[in-house]
Amino acid sequence: LTTEFEIALTLLSAFIVATATMPVAKAASLYFGILARPSPDHPHDKPTALLGGLAVMAGFVAAIGLVGFLSRLPYHSIPWLAAFAIAMCLVGLLDDIVDLKPRHKLYLELAAISVLVWWGPHLDFFPYHAVNIALTIFWLVTATNAFNLIDGIDGLAGGVGIVAALSIATVAGLHQHTGTMVAALAIAGALGGFMVFNFPPASVFMGDEGALAVGLVLGVLSIQASNGGEGSLPARLAMPLLALMVPILDTLTVTVTRLATGNPVSRRGLDHSHHRLTRLGMSSNRAAVALIGLQVIAGACAIALSLVPGYDAILLIPFMALFFALVALFLMDRSFDAEAPGQLEDLPPIARVILS
């Protein structure tokens, strides 16, 4: 198969399968009562189906299976990725059904990710294997949960995921890493099918089973795309972060503000990036568009770094870091934390600096 045909077939097959199976997932969600009910965390008008992630995974697995069979590409770890994405999907499904405690969910994630890293892809940045393994596990746990945390308003997680997947696919394609490119295009196409049903007002949500699985897939593919390049170490380290910049920034700002104000990091709250933007007066739709636009900028930076030869990329990294640091500081505001334990002057000095 030609590369152009692989690209078109992957996107189209993933989109068609996800779109075709989404009504089935929605019907199953309604039948079994696996619903997101209206609450401060879910500000929608009526109970909404939560099993959209199952259809996303169906589209992803079907597309990589079809294209892999027809093109007979050496996919290496892609079958393992599909298997463990399904395993993570089951962890999320269990959470959607019984509402797991955060630490129990983390234990299950760590178990699945540790086995995946043992058998499959891992970072190859450093000469010490144990360091690469530990960093890979940390990155995949972070990426998996960070993506799950931005799934808070209609269209946001799906849109950010599509942009992230397309940027990863572009970087992988530039470095002739065809297996990674096909897998990234498959998740982008499947998320496109999901977005048909998730445009406001959404009739189905991704659910934890979808968000955790997609986050894991994007985390793994960002590693593979970075490993496939020949750029400098700083550029290769920056690429996965840029590919998932919006979820990472959201997790970073929420973690820092909660620690600074004495709140548990694992609590549920209305202090995520999309909540902060809506508190500024944006509609949910405009907040989603703004954050997706930020991910477009980050994805373009990832692609740009992959095109800059050798250590010349180091000249670009400080400017990118400054831009996203300013965005993070803009999002850190004590007024958004409804459960801050006291007045600003009562907080530790570091908290006063960050939150002023």
Describe each region flagged by the PLM.
Residues R279-I297, S306:
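Alpha-helical transmembrane segments of integral membrane proteins
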Residues E6-A8, A183, Y311-F319:
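Hydrophobic alpha-helical transmembrane segments
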Residues I64-L70, I297-G310:
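Juxtamembrane "helix exit" motif at the C-terminal ends of alpha-helical transmembrane segments
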Residues T2-T251:
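"…together with the soluble PPM/PP2C metallo-phosphatase catalytic core" -> "…together
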Residues H175-G179, S306-D312:
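Transmembrane helix interruption/hinge and helix-loop junction motifs
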Residues A87-L94, D312-I350:
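Alpha-helical transmembrane segments and their immediate juxtamembrane interface regions
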Residues L249-P264, L305-P309, F324-D337:
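Membrane-helix cytosolic exit motif
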Residues P23-T48, T253-N285, P341-P348, V353-I354:
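Cytosolic, membrane-interface loops and tails of multi-pass inner-membrane proteins
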